[in-house]
Regions:
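Small/polar beta-strand repeat architecture
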Residues: 1-20, 95-96, 109-217, 222, ...
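Short secondary-structure "cap/edge" segments that initiate or terminate local elements
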Residues: 13-52, 171, 197-249
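Small/flexible residues
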Residues: 25, 159, 165, 234, ...
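Intrinsic-disorder/low-complexity, polar/charged segments enriched in Ser/Thr/Lys/Arg/Asp/Glu/Gln
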Residues: 40-44, 87-89, 163-167, 230-234, ...
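Autoprocessing Asn-cyclization modules and mimics
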Residues: 48-133, 187-189, 194-198, 242-333, ...
Length: 377
């Protein structure tokens, strides 16, 4: 029998582990995702008073079987109007609720309950026929998904001044795949177009050398080896709302680690508009090309334009006398001097993502960073 871990942590460290097989050829790389995310969560509790510490230790020791039900607190929905006795449905924000699974309704450490989920659709949890909420819950109570997990490494404890710190790591035992398309696409690729993304670029270069290879038949062959250091960067995400945190989580599952590429703007002023355009659709725009040494070098580059909350991805089909032609019209109203960024086709350069969820006065703050690598096309 699984036992609920009912204690709200101060921080949650979440690790998502994917596994991608990558094969390199002279024309590019081929990637195969070998499994969905393995979800690992480390709960950190800073406890005072001592009575709560005693409850934590007793709860852990009494679970001899080691099977746990772990609430996913960072995807909890606040019930602004509470919940009533005998209700059979609960309206929640999008999260990993599963038909046949369970959800936790939580008002406080002495008032909570688990409910079974018959169906979950359009943000509504429906309880099985004959089931209902067993008591009233006040406004400000929380509802969150619950997943089965094990704790293979035990409970860690540290004693400080007027405080006891606990940590334990849950390994979720059910498969997790929350993939969804939350971004607009261009050329079949998701475009990261929100303003909570920061990228840092490291310039690449070309290295050439000649190797003498012994072919095993008594002679040496001259082999030319050419290595191109692809564009690399680091992306950092900080999500302050439930909606953006959920969209980010789905984005990671959609990418499946290193498997799926996406478009990432540099968010630099790579090009500056040389005229006002819009609001009517347009497919040509003048740019300030004074600092472009070789205009032909930008042909084929993907670009990103964002002005006043509107944004679009496109590419440069041609350039002539400072006027770039786009393959299809865009409708963004832009002004002289507005920046246009280049956009790189990248993939994550890791199969392991480390996310931090910190509890705040008004919810949860989530953040993580990951390296990205340009995908050769």
């Amino acid at each position: 029998m699984s036992i609920l871990w009912p204690f709200i942590p101060s921080t949650i460290g979440e690790t998502l582990k994917f596994n991608t097989d990558i094969r390199m050829t002279s024309t590019g790389e081929f990637r195969d995702s070998l499994h969905a995310a393995t979800q690992i969560m480390t709960f950190n509790h800073a406890v005072n008073p001592r009575s709560t510490a005693t409850r934590i230790e007793q709860t852990f020791r009494h679970n001899i079987a080691g099977n746990w039900l772990v609430p996913i607190w960072h995807f909890a929905t606040e019930l602004t109007s509470g919940a009533d006795y005998a209700d059979t449905t609960i309206t929640v924000d999008s999260a990993d609720y599963r038909a046949g699974g369970q959800a936790l309704i939580y008002e406080g450490p002495n008032k909570y309950e688990l409910v079974d989920i018959e169906t979950y659709a359009a943000g509504v949890i429906t309880l099985p026929s004959g089931d209902f909420i067993s008591q009233d819950y006040a406004a400000g109570s929380w509802v969150c998904p619950v997943l089965p997990a094990i704790v293979p490494n035990g409970l860690g404890r540290g004693i400080g001044i007027n405080r006891v710190d606990y940590s334990l790591t849950f390994y979720v035992t059910e498969s997790v795949d929350l993939a969804a398309a939350n971004y607009t696409t261009y050329g079949g690729y998701d475009g990261i177009d929100d303003d909570i993304t920061v990228s840092e670029m490291l310039d690449g270069g070309l290295r050439q050398k000649l190797d003498f290879i012994d072919n095993g038949f008594g002679r040496f062959e001259l082999v030319q080896d050419e290595t191109y250091s692809r564009w690399r960067g680091t992306v950092r995400y900080t999500d302050k709302t439930h909606a953006t945190r959920w969209a980010r989580r789905q984005h990671l599952d959609r990418c499946r680690g290193r498997d799926r590429p996406f478009l990432l703007p540099t968010f630099n002023a790579d090009l500056l508009l040389g005229e006002n355009r819009g609001p009517s659709p347009y497919s040509t725009v003048r740019i300030n090309d004074d600092y472009i040494v070789d205009p032909a070098s930008v042909v084929g580059r993907r670009v990103y334009l964002a002005v006043g909350g509107a944004s679009a991805f496109s590419s440069i089909a041609s350039i002539s006398l400072g006027v770039i032609t786009l393959p299809a019209p865009i409708t963004i109203t832009a002004s002289l001097g507005d920046p246009m960024s280049f956009a790189h086709l990248v993939r994550y350069d890791t199969d392991v993502f480390e996310l931090i969820h910190a509890r705040t006065s008004d919810g949860w703050l989530s953040s993580f960073s990951a390296s990205v690598l340009e995908v050769a096309t």
